[in-house]
Amino acid sequence: MDFLVYINRLLLGLVFSIFFGSGATLAGVEEDYAIAKQSFDSGDYKTAMAAWAPLAEEGHSRSQVMLGYAYKNGMGVVKNNKTSFRWYAKAAAQGDSYAQFKVGSAYTNGEVVLGNNQTAVKWFNLAAKQGFGNAQYMLAVNYYNGRGVGKDYKRAYMWCTLALHNGTRLASNIKGQIVKRLLSYHPKDGWHDESAALSEAQEMARVCLASNYQTC
């Protein structure tokens, strides 16, 4: 899931928030956010930033995400990775899946913060359980390589399958490698049906999706 897809989904939720939300205050904040988004989309980044900044300071998570994105890319403000991370971290703490993915990525790459694969996995897991495909892909990579978690090809397959389900095409690059590993899997306690591990991984993916990612 890329940033534009994420934003479009949020805007769909915004419509429901305004019409079915809890009062005029919510509608006013969301309206201000939407107007700023229109400015941003038209290339007037400074106007958008001026509108989002007070909303973000008041704790509006989507505005915090947009500030994180703008500071990361130098759109309407001077590029500043530290400030970008700070805003992403604030939104991530409020449960925003895109922000959680970005925080996890920062810990993976050692950008702004010290690299820490275990912390990265924690944030990817939070985003993945909200159906965020890129985070699901990163979990697949981490389980495949045993980075921040124990190496687990079944869980790597599960998250890779779910990432593809949610439109993260990049996951197709490693799915074949994971399947190859599963088909050659033999536990230490003796002979094992070569197709059993793959079947188990497929069932894990099915159950995870059916539970809306809550039993993964």
For each feature predicted by the language model, list its residue ranges.
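Canonical positions in the second alpha-helix
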Residues: 54-55, 90-91, 126-127, 163
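Bacterial N-terminal signal peptides
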Residues: 11-22
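Terminal, low-structured helical/coil segments at or just beyond the last alpha-helical repeat
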Residues: 171-216
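Bacterial N-terminal signal peptides that target proteins for export
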Residues: 2-12
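Hydrophobic face of amphipathic alpha-helices that form TPR/SEL1-like repeat modules
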Residues: 32-39, 51-55, 66-73, 102-109, ...
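Short helix-capping/linker turns of helical repeat alpha-solenoids
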Residues: 39-43, 57-61, 73-75, 80, ...
